[in-house]
């Protein structure tokens, strides 16, 4: 049990910009840290829903800006960094070895900037076109994406240069993430008639499938790329599917 507690606070400290109340680290809890990503997603989802609620008191364009930026702000733009790195690598259309090298390059290329602008415009337009947004299903969108992230990192073949390449696959963390994903998708559909968490999961899976084929495996950057697009898909489903 202590490894799960360590894993939760390790995940909070690593994947959220909100100050962690207990900064701890235990190497044996690394897999539990990945499995606790959905719990971190719950915190991110609550912040996102709070920003959506606050946006009702702002002019529509400013409210949409707050809603669009909230999931990026709460993570300190961590996953956006992965999104940009993957876009740079994939859109270079070079051989696999070069794409993997570009993925680890700290420089920001033109493809990354263009894709970031398009991503922002899409997310802003989604919320600009929204009426009243149901908050509880929205809370579950980041949970769904991070449950998918935990499953992907703990089951898929990693890129050799990935920080997760030496991590053991399978086990209780995979079961936990799978149960969380199944539970929240079912809960949202049954209680609120919303398939937003399912749409977020579908967006994540498709993005990982594409990036995996282009880059030869799974990595933290690939997960950030897929998570960013998954959250956009979940928000779009919530706003546009009425």
What are these regions (language model features)?
Residues 14, 48, 52, 71, ...:
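Structural signal for membrane-spanning alpha-helices in multi-pass inner-membrane proteins
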Residues 30-48, 89-133, 137-138, 175-188, ...:
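Multi-pass membrane catalytic core of lipid/isoprenoid biosynthesis enzymes
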Residues 35-87, 137-140, 194-213:
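Membrane-embedded alpha-helical segments that form the functional core of polytopic membrane enzymes
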Residues 70-108, 211-230:
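Acidic (Asp/Glu-rich) catalytic motifs at the cytosolic membrane interface
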């Amino acid at each position: 049990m202590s490894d799960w507690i360590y894993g939760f606070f390790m995940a909070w400290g690593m994947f959220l910009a909100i100050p962690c109340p207990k900064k701890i680290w235990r190497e044996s809890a690394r897999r539990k840290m990945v499995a606790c990503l959905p719990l971190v997603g719950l915190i991110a989802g609550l912040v996102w829903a709070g920003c959506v609620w606050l946006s009702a008191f702002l002019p529509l364009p400013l409210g949409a800006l707050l809603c669009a930026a909230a999931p990026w702000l709460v993570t300190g733009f961590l996953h956006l960094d992965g999104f940009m790195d993957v876009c740079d690598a994939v859109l270079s259309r070079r051989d696999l070895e070069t794409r993997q090298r570009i993925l680890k390059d700290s420089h920001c290329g033109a493809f990354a900037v263009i894709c970031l602008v398009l991503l922002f415009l899409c997310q802003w337009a989604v919320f600009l076109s929204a009426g009243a947004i149901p908050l509880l299903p929205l809370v579950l969108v980041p949970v769904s994406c991070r449950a998918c992230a935990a499953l992907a990192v703990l089951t898929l073949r990693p890129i050799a240069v990935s920080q997760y390449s030496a991590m053991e696959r399978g086990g209780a963390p995979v079961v936990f993430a799978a149960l969380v994903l199944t539970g929240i998708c079912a809960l949202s559909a049954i209680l609120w008639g919303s398939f937003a968490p399912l749409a977020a999961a579908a967006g994540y899976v498709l993005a990982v499938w594409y990036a995996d084929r282009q880059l030869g495996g799974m990595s933290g950057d690939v997960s950030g790329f897929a998570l960013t697009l998954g959250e956009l898909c979940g928000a779009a489903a919530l706003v546009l599917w009425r």
